[in-house]
Amino acid sequence: MKMFLAESWQDCLEKIEVLNPYDGQPVDTVPKASLSDVETALKSAFQGTQPMRKLSGFDRFKILKRAAELVEKQLEDLARTITLEEGKILAEARFEVSRTAETLMVSAEEAKRIAGEMVPLDGAPGAGNRMGFTLRVPCGVVLAISPFTFPLNLVPHNVGPAIAAGNSVIAKPAAQTPLIA
């Protein structure tokens, strides 16, 4: 397996072996990121803030909707990976994959609705007929650290809203379940 870093899939010299928790057999290997890789990820994420900020809500909706469709399309493969890597029974793994697609679709729909508010200021002395307003703007870079308990579904709980709001994201999966995340 390779690591997605700075807009491309990259290999690393150092690897971490992912083992099946039931029989201890190797499932796959994943790259072990170096300090240099982390610095590259941070730099790339910060460079990505401006393009992300410029995407319309509808564009972010399309990205997240497409991600949900891809998850649904690969349900069986993803469920089997969860089973091999984490040890969940296949029925629970399938449910997790379905929930992942739903979570991505919720974020997709919210991307179209992110807006500010109009606030009447007449509750303050001298404010009279004035109105205030708020704007929702991207924060910049979001670090999405996910636990191993629901390794696929908890990633979009962090990544989905971050993308919906126009942020750049760095995802860090749990060490126990790096394949599925």
Regions found by a protein language model. Name each.
Residues 121-181:
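Conserved small-residue-rich beta-alpha loop and adjacent elements
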Residues 1-129:
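N-terminal Rossmann-like NAD(P)+-binding subdomain of aldehyde/semialdehyde dehydrogenases
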